[in-house]
Amino acid sequence: MSVKIRLARFGAKKRPFYRVVVADSRVARDGRFIELLGFYNPMLPKEHPSFLKVKIDRLKYWLSVGAQPTERISWFIKKGLISTEAA
């Protein structure tokens, strides 16, 4: 079983809202997931506090046990929008 940290799309047409989830890679994008880690709202400006919220401790846990982040989640980490540094 390959576990991925990825975005699951929700919201209305032309008003996307994403959940950051941990899911089996074989499951559909918006299907069943193992754990909800947070959410991402691309309709808000980056400075808004609700633009991207993630449970950092759970993200670190899943990365430590071998879950693979998708391209977009990796981009968030590289840009510093999600911090994986020790507090």
UniProtKB/Swiss-Prot annotation:
Disulfide bonds: none annotated. Transmembrane segments: none annotated. GO terms for biological process: translation. One of its GO terms (cellular component) is small ribosomal subunit. InterPro entries: Ribosomal_bS16, Ribosomal_bS16_CS, Ribosomal_bS16_dom_sf. Keywords: Ribonucleoprotein, Ribosomal protein. Belongs to the bacterial ribosomal protein bS16 family. This is Small ribosomal subunit protein bS16. It comes from Ehrlichia ruminantium (strain Gardel).
